[in-house]
From Swiss-Prot:
It comes from Priodontes maximus. GO terms for biological process: aerobic respiration. One of its GO terms (molecular function) is NADH dehydrogenase (ubiquinone) activity. It is found in: Mitochondrion inner membrane. It holds the Pfam family NADHdh. Its main location: mitochondrion. It catalyses: a ubiquinone + NADH + 5 H(+)(in) = a ubiquinol + NAD(+) + 4 H(+)(out). The lineage of its organism: Eukaryota, Metazoa, Chordata, Craniata, Vertebrata. Keywords: Electron transport, Membrane, Mitochondrion, Mitochondrion inner membrane, NAD, Respiratory chain, Translocase, Transmembrane, Transmembrane helix, Transport, Ubiquinone. This is NADH-ubiquinone oxidoreductase chain 1.
Length: 318
C-alpha cells in the first residue's frame, strides 16, 4: 500500500516535470514571436515524450579519463534527491507527515550540492569543474538566506511542520505581512535552482554548458529532470509558505486544485523571468546575496522573533 502511495506521488510529479519543459519552450517561443514546438503531436503536445525516448535510447558516452562510478552516481543522486524533497509536502496530505518537514527539505537541498560537485569532478574537464564550483558556491550562498527566511516564517507558524501553515494562513496569506521576505525568497529560489538570470553555471560563451558539459543521453536527462523537478518543488514550497491554499476538510480536492493553480502561476513567472532578463555577472550575484539579502533577512528575522514576544503573542506550543 505504501508503495502505491509513493507511485501516486512520483508519477504526477514526473508528468508535470515533462510537460513543464514543453510549457517553457512554448512560453519562450510566444515571447519571441514564434510558435515553439508544434510538429510532434497536436500543438506539439507529444514533444516531451519524443525528447525522453530520444535521450534514453542514445548511447551514454563518457570521457575516457572520467571516474566511472562517480560519473554515473552524480545524476542518479541529483534526481533521487529532487524526488525525495516532495515527501513532506502537504497536498493536502503529505506522504510522511514529518515534524521537521522544513528542515528535511533544507537538508536535502544541501545534499544536492554534492551531485553537482561530483559531476564536475568526475567529468575530468576544466569547463565542467569550473561550472560545478560556480554552481556549488551559488547554491551554498543562497541557501543561507533561504534558511533564515524559513526560520522567520517558522517563528510566525510556531512549528516546523509544513501542514500547520495552512492553519496559520486561514485568515491572511503570509505574503501580505512578509512581502519583503517573499520577494527575497523568490529571487533566492531562482538562484538556488540555477535559473536565469542566475544561470551562471551555463555561461555558454565561457563554460559551454556548465557542470553537465560531458554528459549525454540518460545521465544528462537525469540532471535535466532533476532541475525541472526542483523548479516545481520550489514553487510548490513558495505556495505553501506564502500563499496558503484554501483547506476545507470536507473537500480536500479544493485544496489540491487551489495549490496546483498557484504553483503553476509561480512556475510561469519563473519562465517569464527567464524570457525577460539578461544574465547577472558573477560578482553581482554574490554581492546581491552577501551585501543585500543577508543583512536584510537577518534584520527581519530578529524583528519576527522580537515582535510576538514584545506583544506577548507567542504561539502556545513554543
Amino acid at each position: 500500500m505504501f508503495l502505491m502511495n509513493i507511485l501516486c506521488l512520483i508519477i504526477p510529479i514526473l508528468l508535470a516535470m515533462a510537460f513543464l519543459t514543453l510549457v517553457e519552450r512554448k512560453i519562450l517561443g510566444y515571447m519571441q514571436l514564434r510558435k515553439g514546438p508544434n510538429v510532434v503531436g497536436p500543438y506539439g503536445l507529444l514533444q516531451p515524450i519524443a525528447d525522453a525516448i530520444k535521450l534514453f535510447i542514445k548511447e551514454p558516452l563518457r570521457p575516457l579519463t572520467s571516474s566511472k562510478t562517480m560519473f554515473i552516481l552524480a545524476p542518479t543522486l541529483a534526481f533521487s534527491l529532487a524526488l525525495s524533497m516532495w515527501i513532506p509536502m502537504p497536498m493536502p496530505h503529505p506522504l510522511v507527515n514529518l515534524n521537521l518537514g522544513v528542515l528535511f527539505i533544507l537538508a536535502l537541498s544541501s545534499l544536492a550540492v554534492y551531485s553537482i560537485l561530483w559531476s564536475g569532478w568526475a567529468s575530468n574537464s576544466k569547463y565542467a569543474l569550473i561550472g560545478a564550483l560556480r554552481a556549488v558556491a551559488q547554491t551554498i550562498s543562497y541557501e543561507v538566506t533561504l534558511a533564515i527566511i524559513l526560520l522567520s516564517i517558522m517563528m510566525l507558524n510556531g512549528s516546523f511542520t509544513l501542514s500547520t501553515l495552512t492553519t496559520t494562513q486561514e485568515h491572511l496569506w503570509l505574503i501580505f505581512p512578509l512581502w519583503p521576505l517573499a520577494m527575497m525568497w523568490f529571487i533566492s529560489t531562482l538562484a538556488e535552482t540555477n535559473r536565469a538570470p542566475f544561470d551562471l553555471t551555463e555561461g555558454e560563451s565561457e563554460l559551454v554548458s556548465g557542470f553537465n558539459v560531458e554528459y549525454a543521453a540518460g545521465p544528462f536527462a537525469l540532471f535535466f529532470m532533476a532541475e525541472y523537478t526542483n523548479i516545481i518543488m520550489m514553487n510548490a514550497l513558495t505556495t505553501i509558505l506564502f500563499l496558503g491554499a484554501l483547506h476545507n476538510p470536507l473537500f480536500p480536492e479544493l485544496f489540491t486544485v487551489n495549490f496546483v493553480t498557484k504553483t503553476l502561476l509561480l512556475t510561469v513567472t519563473f519562465l517569464w523571468v527567464r524570457a525577460s532578463y539578461p544574465r547577472f555577472r558573477y560578482d553581482q550575484l554574490m554581492h546581491l546575496l552577501w551585501k543585500s539579502f543577508l543583512p536584510l533577512t537577518l534584520a527581519l528575522c530578529m524583528l519576527h522573533v522580537s515582535t510576538p514576544t514584545m506583544l506577548a503573542g507567542i504561539p502556545p506550543h513554543m
